[in-house]
């Protein structure tokens, strides 16, 4: 299918109010193109979020649409670059994070880091080759793991987004943004940290933007720099996707098993051979419904629940219906998508209009809240499209279509779904059943209405695949599909017709005045409330698009401002009128969904904004051109508003069927042909109108190389209740017939039914279905109008002369003899070509409508015959005629014959519609065939054995009249069934339906036709593709219009042919209303071919033009020639300048314009008034020379000359005798006078050919070039200013005022000055200048404060800087091409032409003198020896070449045969090397002009790989007047790092510049502080007014001269950024180089000293950390006595130097979290003060050959641990300090709180490098239950010393010697601080006694008391008894 959009220069057809665009609509394709547009989301809880959050989101919703539509469907090279910079706030304790990044099946990971805020700064490259649409569907997945965990839960968090999201960002890049990580499996979890990343999508020819790494400018506030702004909070939402049911699922399984069941008597169901289930996928998650076996209309009634973070970075919810297979993989039935950007709105879409500055702001701010809504959809059906429905049992060649890859060619069912979104993160099932209440609710959305469709086929032309008869089928859904048995048989197919020749090249179907009609009824939901609005918005969009095209044409044509303002005002007024028109209301509609209401609200609000913005623009705009951007934004917005995601009505599909096989198709969106009773605007664009439809092959691999056919079809679709409205749209008279064929066979010389074999006496057209007259029953509502009649189908019986205007009749004269006898007349004297007996030539008459073109029959001797035309043969029995013939007579020959021919031509007096009277034989209506199934013909032959004739019976409607009666044709006409067949009634019915034999035949008869006259003015083409080996083509064009075509003449050996030809189609009969034809005229299709003498002509391209229709020829409107694109396989292959006009013609042709003049017989030129107006023009050609000419036919190009062609004029240079020695032309200027069009749009190109003069007179074309745009070479020859005069453009070749220049440099500086300079160079160097220029002021030291100047850093190549005009101001470089373009590739470059052109008008009066010549006083063409200095600063983002994702780059310089391979200075393991190298070599220009700088990857064992290369044209830099050979610095310095390096002083350069400008020399005064130049006065004071004067400056006159030079637009001192390219991925950046080149001609003396750009060396520093005390440390252990305690020690290191970890001794038994240490850590490190980064060099693995250098920010990590002797130590907490932004500590521990570590802007920080030392308390933190807690406080002294200070003030680690600066005494720890089992006595004293002493004392007292009591009670009885015995004792 071809869709065509006019170029911006095209104008609208004055008789076509609908514009000039004929586009075959394609709803599914649009959906595919837009389905990748990135969703930016919406958060209803934050409607008024700060900043422009919603606006940014809305722009993401909008902006993808513009870029996506221009994407190719051809696989291309792409490169995705992902840079992982750093992490922040990662959860976990003592983690070792690693990031894995996955894109398109490729995964890369970072190095393992330590800590919760790791710094990675690693870049990954992903090279892919796929189509852009496939690429944009790919996902980028960031996964963060804890590498120290071996558990399954090592995943910390992840983040996903589509590649399409990145592609839609400015520059296709997301730079230095934070992404929020979350747990994909736990919706209740919060943020899992942040990653800062940069992402780029680099396509062919794209330049990735350069990252700016400004530490001061970079925002460390994560929330404000999130990829999704903080105002739109990420929330967990649940998508409830309810999948109710599906219908019309096609057969997917083989019927073999069902057939076996049937054999054994089991039930079978062949209609439901499919086991469907639905797979839902979104953002990497997939959920499947249940499988329902053997059901083509399954009901799942299940809800899929998808929990995601919203707004989502992924766009499409993809639904794929699969057929389950037990043994093989599941087959896809079809795929459809829900695009979030279409079913949700953020509310920011409206705000974007205000941001443009012209929008209105009348709506309240709450409008955003009102129009924003979460994703919602349905209940609504989603249609599935894919491969054809017919099941074959073989692998489906179109299976990719079922996965949504490409445009589906057939309807494959539909799925009823509903989507709702809830702000809920509760864990629920992934899939659950839908409640019965919900199933009942959805019933009202399934109510069906009857729709009627009628399609009238007006023409089918441009057919090239001929053979079998052709018919067309129209279907909508399954209705009308002739191969499907699920619907009633309908009159959905046309009759079979055979194509006939159009007399020139194509074939067409001869429908004449009887047009085939198809009609069908179908049942769908009434969604008119959606489609009415869609059609209204589309009409509005089309009008705006047409008006914009008219406005652009007017701007391009440079119309007066007044006329321009009128066109613009008409556009604005039309837009305001359109947007003010009310939209249809949704009130009262039964099946309105939530999405309908929300989109209606969004549309109403958007239209109001556009309306108010247009009103405001109308009153305020002053510049028409400046408003175009905003108007086009409105157009984009309207196009988005016109999209309808809930379009459940399937497309109308037209199939071209040949031999019962589907050949080609076209899809027409139903809404385009739908009738609406709402209003005329709400009707479809082509409803009831004849439109042009180009069919296309399914999955066409040739991408439109051949058009199957061009259809003109009128389609009407409407509800059955309004079917009578069809009467007002219909034209002609509709006729309905039932038909059958009577068959007979020839048996024993008689015709009868005996030998029919399996054929029936009466059958359908295929002969396979038996029919009887009596069994035909008219459909309900119809009745017979007539009896059965014989009615032959003439369109199937075309003769050989059909369609020809000239034809040659032939007849053979036959003679026979016995061998050796005399020749006599044969029995059958005259026969035709088939050997059938024929009448004699004298008896043959000319057929009706033809006249003889010559006098009589002539012998044909242009064959393999003798001089009399005879050819001879031998008859061998049983044959009666010879099988072969020869030209020479032999004795044994028995037969001879000769061919008699006579030409005839069409009789112009006989109308094409006139027909001859039928003979009696023809009236019988029989058509004959040699065998059953063979092609039929009218005239009987002796070899015929089968014949048939068609019987037809006309029907008429019984209860209603008018064209709408055809919609009653529903159901079968009836068939005859035998008893056996009745047993298989269902199968017979299926077969009948399959062949469609019992459906009525509908046709539309036109009683009247109109004769038109077409003139196609083909003027010229440009930029065609070369298809011949000589680098050119021989183009000619076939021009097709309806059933006629003509061919232009062939133009030899050109890619820019000028045909200047008018093709006249004298009489073309078109049936239908002329006004309808004027509104939608047929297309003029031009196909351009390359003529080849041998082989088939090759297709160059196709162009489509809309003719201007003149219904009133008296109206004096001439068509305008316009450029139309020539397309081949969706590739632009040139342009064609043409116009066409279609004039309604009177019978006698009296109203036609006069014929144009003839250039040759029957070749008419383009007439005056249409052809361009020309003017005598001078073209001066500067032919400077040829470069880099490649060999031709294995021989070098040695003696070339140059030919210039333009407008039919040719000039040629002299021959270069030896190209290698003298590549320049001896005579450099050519002059030619040409008649060129005044309008720049019509100017022909300049063609350059290079001819090599070789021995023996051979002059092959060895290269050619076409210059299409000549406007840049136009000039005013009388211009008095001479800044741009060519003779003034050479500043170097003639810039020496003196022949010898001697520069003497004496070292007269005192010793002290030299010492001062050396010291200064330690403070500032060239890198200081570089970083000051790039804005990285933190790296440049005191450079700016000293008053030094900066240089210019260009982010592109110097020649691409716009103000330097490509450095081609003296001469341009034109690429020369040669050869044939194959496989859609461009021809190869075989050389370069150095030259230029000057084009200016010449006076028409020969007496007026010609203007002065432009190319004068040219420099000499001799060679120049030069010194070249190449400075390589650094590489940026080089393509990795090693397995570790890095490379080892080094520089290789190539200049002709000179090579510098700097392999020894490779830089290991980096993608961003700092080279800092300067190379110097000499060369001769122009022979050695191409300087090639390559970057290679160093490999020890294998061959070094090339990363990429860039090439610099030194000749252009040398010749350019912009002084690009050596950039001018800002100041003139005679010493220091900015010392002058050019050969000439500023005053000398200024004198040369004045001479080249033809200005007076500069005059100095006031001791060189005042200068007069070009009539302007300059003073030194005005340039140095606020500038600091330093000791390195030169004399005042030189400084002033330099300041003046810098005002003249010359190249400043600079560093350019050059992109590296590789042949592996051409046109895709492989990285960049920052560098510059100086070129010094040796004739001017030696240059100044070069710059020293050697990279800086890191300095050694020492960080001393004294850990004094800790406090409030978490008590992690319990002692044996039950006390909480910790054995505290502190561990510390600098990131990158983990192998130098240090730790204190252990403070045992801390009972209150206090620890005393007095311990010193000493961390040596290498540091770059200027860049504020640490340099770490170490081997990544033990097997690594080189150390890898890392640059890391200086940080200190300290951790507090609890010591365990018998288990692993316990981690308690940590603190991480940035030495550049060190948190100011608290002086006392009471003020040391957790707030000190908050990363906000109010934190007090200081640089330790500036403060040198700081002391105080810092808080440590840990994580517990997902929250950060205070883990303790640590008192430290931090001190940074350089190497010298460290040596002067030594200090040892810990408390080792030298223990000084300061001296650390052992800590005064409590007596309880010791290891308990090493000191039992201390354990008893300090642990047991201290805690249990009172227990012990109590126990002793208790023991004594008990002992006393025991003794007492022991001795008491004895004492008592003794007292009793001896009381007196």
Swiss-Prot record:
Its cofactor is Ca(2+). Gene3D superfamilies: C2 domain. Ca(2+) 2 binds at residues 267, 323, 325, 331. Residues 27-36 have a biased composition (Acidic residues). It is found in: Cell membrane; Nucleus membrane; Cytoplasmic vesicle membrane. Residues 1845-1858 have a biased composition (Basic and acidic residues). InterPro entries: C2_dom, C2_domain_sf, C2B_Ferlin, C2C_Ferlin, C2D_Ferlin, C2E_Ferlin, C2F_Ferlin, FerIin_dom. Keywords: Calcium, Cell membrane, Cytoplasmic vesicle, Membrane, Metal-binding, Nucleus, Repeat, Signal-anchor, Transmembrane, Transmembrane helix. Residues 898-907 have a biased composition (Basic residues). Residues 1-53, 898-918, 1845-1867 are annotated as: Disordered. Belongs to the ferlin family. This is Myoferlin.
């Amino acid at each position: 299918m071809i869709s065509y959009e006019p170029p911006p220069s095209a104008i609208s057809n004055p008789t076509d109010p609908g514009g000039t665009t004929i586009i075959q609509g394609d709803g599914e394709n649009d959906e595919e193109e837009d389905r990748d547009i990135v969703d930016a989301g919406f958060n209803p809880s934050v409607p008024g979020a700060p900043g422009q959050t919603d606006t940014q989101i809305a722009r993401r919703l909008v902006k993808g649409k513009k870029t996506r539509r221009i994407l190719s469907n051809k696989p291309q090279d792409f490169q995705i670059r992902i840079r992982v910079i750093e992490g922040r706030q990662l959860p976990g304790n003592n983690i070792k994070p690693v990031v894995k990044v996955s894109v398109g099946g490729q995964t890369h990971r970072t190095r393992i880091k330590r800590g919760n805020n790791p710094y990675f700064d690693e870049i990954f490259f992903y090279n892919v080759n796929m189509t852009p649409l496939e690429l944009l569907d790919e996902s980028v997945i960031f996964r963060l793991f804890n590498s120290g965990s071996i558990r399954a839960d090592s995943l910390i968090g992840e983040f996903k987004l589509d590649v399409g999201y990145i592609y839609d960002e400015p520059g296709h890049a997301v730079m230095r943004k934070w992404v929020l990580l979350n747990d994909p499996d736990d919706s209740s979890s919060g943020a899992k940290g942040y990653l800062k990343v940069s992402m780029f999508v680099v396509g062919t020819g794209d330049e990735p933007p350069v990252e700016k790494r400004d530490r001061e400018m970079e925002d460390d506030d994560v929330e404000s720099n999130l990829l999704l702004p903080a105002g739109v909070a990420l929330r967990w939402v649940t998508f409830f996707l309810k999948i109710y049911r599906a219908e019309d699922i096609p057969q997917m399984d083989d019927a073999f098993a069902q057939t076996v069941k049937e054999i054994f008597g089991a039930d079978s169901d062949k209609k439901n051979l499919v086991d469907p289930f639905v797979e839902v996928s979104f953002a990497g998650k997939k959920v499947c419904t249940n499988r329902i076996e053997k059901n083509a209309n399954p009901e799942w009634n299940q809800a899929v629940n998808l929990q995601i973070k919203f707004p989502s970075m992924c766009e499409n919810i993809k639904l794929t219906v699969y057929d389950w297979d037990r043994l093989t993989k599941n087959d896809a039935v079809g795929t459809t998508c829900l695009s979030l950007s279409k079913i949700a709105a953020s509310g920011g879409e409206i705000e974007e209009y205000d941001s443009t500055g012209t929008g209105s702001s009348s709506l309240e701010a709450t409008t955003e809240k009102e129009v924003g809504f979460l994703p919602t959809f349905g209940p609504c059906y989603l249609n599935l499209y894919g491969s054809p429905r017919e099941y074959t049992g073989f692998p489906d060649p179109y299976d990719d279509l079922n996965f949504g890859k490409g445009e589906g060619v057939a309807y494959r069912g539909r799925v009823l779904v509903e989507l709702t979104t809830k702000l809920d993160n509760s864990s629920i099932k992934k899939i659950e059943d839908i409640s019965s209440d919900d199933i009942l609710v959805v019933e009202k959305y399934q109510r069906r209405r009857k729709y009627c469709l009628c399609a009238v086929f007006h023409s089918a032309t441009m057919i090239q695949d001929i053979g079998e008869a052709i018919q067309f089928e129209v279907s909508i859904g399954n209705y009308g599909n002739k191969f499907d048995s699920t619907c009633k048989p309908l009159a959905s197919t046309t009759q079979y017709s055979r194509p006939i020749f159009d007399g020139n090249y194509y074939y067409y179907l001869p429908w004449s005045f009887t047009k085939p009609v198809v009609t069908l009824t179908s049942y769908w939901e009434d969604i008119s409330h959606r489609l009415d609005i869609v059609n209204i918005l589309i009409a509005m969009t089309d009008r705006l698009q047409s008006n914009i095209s008219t406005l652009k044409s007017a701007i391009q044509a440079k119309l007066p401002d007044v006329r321009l303002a009128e066109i613009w005002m008409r556009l604005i007024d039309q837009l305001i009128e359109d947007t003010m028109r009310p939209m249809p209301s949704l009130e009262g509609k039964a099946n309105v969904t939530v999405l309908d209401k929300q989109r209606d609200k969004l549309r109403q609000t958007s239209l109001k904004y556009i309306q108010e913005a247009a009103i405001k623009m109308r009153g305020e705009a002053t510049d028409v051109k400046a408003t175009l951007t905003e108007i086009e934004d409105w157009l984009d917005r309207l196009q988005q508003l016109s999209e309808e995601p809930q379009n459940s009505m399937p497309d109308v599909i037209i199939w071209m069927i040949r031999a019962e096989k589907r050949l080609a198709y076209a899809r027409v969106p139903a809404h385009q042909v739908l009738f609406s009773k709402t209003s005329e605007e709400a009707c479809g664009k082509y409803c009831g109108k004849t439109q042009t439809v180009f069919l296309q092959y399914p999955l066409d691999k040739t991408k439109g190389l051949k058009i199957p056919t061009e259809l003109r079809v009128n389609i009407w679709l409407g509800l059955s209740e309004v079917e009578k409205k069809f009467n007002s749209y219909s034209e002609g008279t509709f006729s309905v017939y039932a038909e059958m064929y009577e068959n007979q066979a020839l048996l024993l010389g008689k015709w009868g039914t005996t030998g029919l074999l399996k054929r029936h006496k009466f059958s359908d057209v295929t002969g396979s279905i038996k029919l009887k007259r009596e069994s035909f029953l008219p459909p309900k509502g119809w009745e017979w109008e007539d009896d059965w009649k014989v009615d032959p189908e003439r369109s199937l019986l075309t003769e050989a002369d059909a369609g020809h205007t000239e034809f040659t009749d032939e007849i053979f004269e036959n003679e026979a003899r016995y061998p050796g006898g005399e020749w006599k007349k044969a029995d059958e004297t005259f026969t035709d070509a088939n050997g059938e007996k024929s009448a004699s030539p004298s008896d043959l008459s000319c057929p009706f409508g033809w006249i003889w073109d010559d006098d009589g029959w002539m012998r044909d001797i242009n064959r393999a015959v003798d001089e009399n035309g005879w050819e001879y043969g031998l008859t061998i029995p049983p044959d009666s005629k010879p099988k072969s013939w020869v030209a020479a007579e032999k004795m044994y020959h028995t037969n001879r014959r000769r061919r008699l021919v006579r030409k005839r031509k069409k009789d112009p007096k006989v109308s094409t519609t006139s027909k001859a009277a039928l003979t009696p034989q023809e009236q019988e209506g029989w058509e004959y065939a040699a065998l059953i199934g063979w092609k039929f013909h009218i005239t009987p032959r002796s070899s015929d054995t089968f014949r048939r004739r068609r019987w037809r019976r006309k029907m008429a409607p019984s209860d209603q009249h008018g064209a709408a009666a055809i919609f009653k044709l529903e159901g079968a006409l009836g068939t005859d069934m035998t008893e056996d067949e009745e047993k298989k009634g269902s199968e017979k019915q299926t077969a009948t339906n399959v062949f469609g034999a019992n459906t009525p035949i509908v046709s539309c008869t036109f009683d009247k036709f109109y004769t038109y006259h077409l003139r196609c003015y083909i003027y010229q083409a440009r930029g065609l593709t070369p298809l011949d080996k000589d680098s050119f083509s021989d183009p000619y064009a076939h021009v097709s219009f309806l059933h006629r075509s003509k061919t232009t003449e062939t133009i030899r050996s050109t890619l820019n042919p000028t045909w200047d030809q008018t093709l006249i189609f004298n009489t073309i009969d078109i049936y239908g209303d002329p006004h309808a034809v004027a509104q939608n005229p047929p297309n003029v299709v031009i196909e351009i071919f390359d003529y080849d003498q041998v082989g088939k002509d090759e297709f160059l391209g196709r162009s489509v033009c809309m003719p201007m229709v003149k219904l009133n020829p008296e109206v004096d409107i001439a068509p305008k020639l316009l450029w139309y694109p020539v397309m081949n396989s969706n590739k632009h292959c040139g342009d064609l300048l043409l116009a066409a006009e279609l004039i309604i013609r009177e019978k006698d042709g009296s109203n036609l314009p006069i014929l144009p003049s003839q250039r040759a017989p029957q070749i008419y030129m383009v007439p005056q008034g249409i052809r361009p107006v020309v003017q005598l023009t001078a073209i001066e050609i500067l032919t400077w020379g040829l470069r880099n000419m490649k060999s031709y036919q294995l021989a070098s190009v040695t003696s070339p000359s140059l030919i210039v062609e333009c407008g039919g004029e040719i000039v040629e240079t002299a021959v270069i005798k030896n190209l290698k020695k003298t590549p320049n032309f001896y005579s450099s200027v050519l002059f030619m006078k040409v008649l060129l069009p005044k309008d720049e749009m019509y100017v022909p190109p300049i063609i350059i050919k290079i001819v090599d003069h070789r021995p023996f007179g051979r002059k092959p074309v060895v290269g050619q070039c076409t210059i299409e745009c000549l406007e840049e070479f136009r000039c005013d020859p009388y211009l008095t200013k001479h800044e741009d005069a060519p003779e003034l453009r050479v500043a170097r070749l003639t810039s020496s005022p003196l022949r010898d220049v001697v520069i003497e440099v004496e070292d007269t500086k005192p010793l002290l000055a030299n010492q001062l300079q050396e010291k200064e160079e330690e403070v500032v160097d060239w890198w200081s200048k570089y970083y000051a220029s790039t804005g990285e002021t933190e790296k440049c030291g005191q450079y700016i404060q000293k008053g030094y100047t900066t240089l210019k850093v260009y982010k592109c190549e110097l020649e691409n800087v716009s103000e330097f005009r490509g450095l081609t101001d003296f001469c341009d470089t034109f690429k020369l091409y040669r050869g044939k373009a194959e496989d859609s590739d461009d021809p190869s470059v075989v050389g370069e032409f150095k030259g230029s052109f000057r084009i200016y008008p010449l006076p028409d009066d020969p007496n007026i003198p010609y203007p002065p010549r432009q190319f004068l006083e040219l420099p000499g063409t001799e060679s120049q020896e030069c010194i070249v200095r190449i400075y390589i600063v650094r590489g940026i983002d080089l393509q990795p070449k090693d397995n570790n994702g890095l490379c080892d780059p080094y520089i290789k310089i190539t200049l002709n045969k000179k090579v510098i391979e700097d392999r020894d200075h490779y830089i290991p393991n980096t993608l961003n090397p700092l080279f800092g190298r300067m190379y110097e070599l000499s060369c001769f220009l122009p022979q050695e002009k191409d300087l090639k700088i390559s970057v290679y990857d160093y490999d020890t064992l294998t061959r070094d790989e090339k990363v990429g290369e860039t090439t610099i044209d030194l000749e252009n830099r040398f010749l350019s007047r912009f002084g690009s050979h050596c950039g001018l610095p800002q100041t003139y310095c005679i010493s220091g790092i900015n010392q002058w390096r050019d050969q000439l002083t500023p005053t000398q350069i200024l004198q040369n510049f004045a001479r080249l400008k033809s200005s007076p020399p500069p005059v100095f005064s006031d001791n060189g502080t005042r200068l007069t130049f070009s009539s302007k006065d300059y003073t030194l004071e005005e340039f140095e007014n606020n500038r600091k004067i330093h000791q390195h400056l030169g004399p005042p006159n030189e400084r002033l001269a330099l300041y003046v030079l810098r005002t003249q637009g010359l190249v400043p001192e600079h560093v350019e950024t050059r992109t590296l390219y590789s042949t592996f991925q051409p046109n895709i950046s492989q990285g960049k180089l920052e560098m510059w080149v100086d070129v010094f001609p040796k004739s001017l003396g030696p240059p100044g000293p070069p710059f020293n750009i050697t990279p800086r060396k890191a300095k050694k520093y020492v960080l001393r950390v004294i850990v004094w005390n800790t406090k409030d440390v978490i008590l992690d252990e319990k002692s044996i006595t039950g006390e909480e305690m910790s054995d505290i020690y502190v561990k510390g290191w600098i990131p990158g130097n983990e192998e130098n970890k240090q730790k204190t001794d252990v403070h045992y038994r801390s009972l209150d979290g206090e620890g005393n240490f007095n311990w010193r850590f000493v961390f040596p490190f290498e540091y770059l003060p200027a860049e504020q980064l640490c340099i770490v060099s170490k081997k990544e693995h033990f097997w690594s050959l080189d150390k890898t250098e890392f640059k890391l920010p200086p940080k200190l990590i300290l951790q507090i641990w609890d010591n365990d002797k018998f288990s692993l130590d316990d981690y308690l907490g940590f603190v991480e300090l940035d030495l550049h932004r060190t948190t100011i500590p608290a002086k006392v521990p009471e003020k040391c709180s957790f707030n000190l570590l908050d990363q906000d802007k109010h934190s007090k920080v200081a640089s330790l490098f500036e403060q040198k030392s700081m002391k105080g308390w810092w808080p440590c933190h840990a994580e517990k239950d997902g929250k950060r807690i205070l883990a303790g406080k640590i008192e430290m002294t931090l001190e940074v010393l350089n190497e010298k200070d460290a040596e002067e003030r030594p200090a040892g680690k810990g408390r080792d010697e030298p223990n000084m600066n300061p001296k650390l005494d052992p800590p005064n720890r409590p007596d309880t601080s010791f290891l308990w089992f090493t000191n039992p006595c201390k354990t008893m004293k300090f642990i047991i006694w201290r805690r249990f002493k009172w227990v012990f004392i109590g126990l002793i007292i208790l023991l004594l008391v008990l002992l006393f009591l025991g003794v007492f009670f022991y001795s008491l009885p004895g004492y008592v008894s003794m007292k009793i015995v001896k009381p007196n004792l």
